[in-house]
Amino acid sequence: MVQLTTIFCKAYHGGHLTIRLALGGCTNRPFYRIVAAHNKCPRDGRFVEQLGSYDPLPNSHGEKLVALNLDRIRHWIGCGAHLSKPMEKLLGLSGFFPLHPMMITNAERLRRRRAREVLLASQKAESEAKETEAS
């Protein structure tokens, strides 16, 4: 019996395996497959294994859907596969890895911006109330 994992885990000449997103879907309706592929292959080209899927457009409940096969992702990382930046972020949000530093920074910026908008809106409402009282 032949073990396929040893065949797939062998060194790939001229590159390495990468876990990345492969674009699918239609115009204005993207859909991504999470795949293990050689880094020299095109983005939507041949891949070794599909590890999940990602739908970036929110559904009717406002959710972006992600399906991951964490056992196989763990296997390919153990075989030396690299991760693309978007995959690092997705796996950080799923709890598989620690959060990517840019995700934390972006969340802090968004929180400050929203707090500033709320403060400006309340100040504007107060100034309008004072103007109506003065009139």
Swiss-Prot record:
Keywords: Mitochondrion, Ribonucleoprotein, Ribosomal protein, Transit peptide
CC annotations in GO: cytosol; mitochondrial inner membrane; mitochondrial small ribosomal subunit; mitochondrion
GO BP term, pick one: mitochondrial translation
GO molecular function annotation: structural constituent of ribosome
Primary site of residence: mitochondrion
Transit peptide (first-last residue): 1-34
Subunit structure: Component of the mitochondrial ribosome small subunit (28S) which comprises a 12S rRNA and about 30 distinct proteins.
Name of the protein in its database record: Small ribosomal subunit protein bS16m
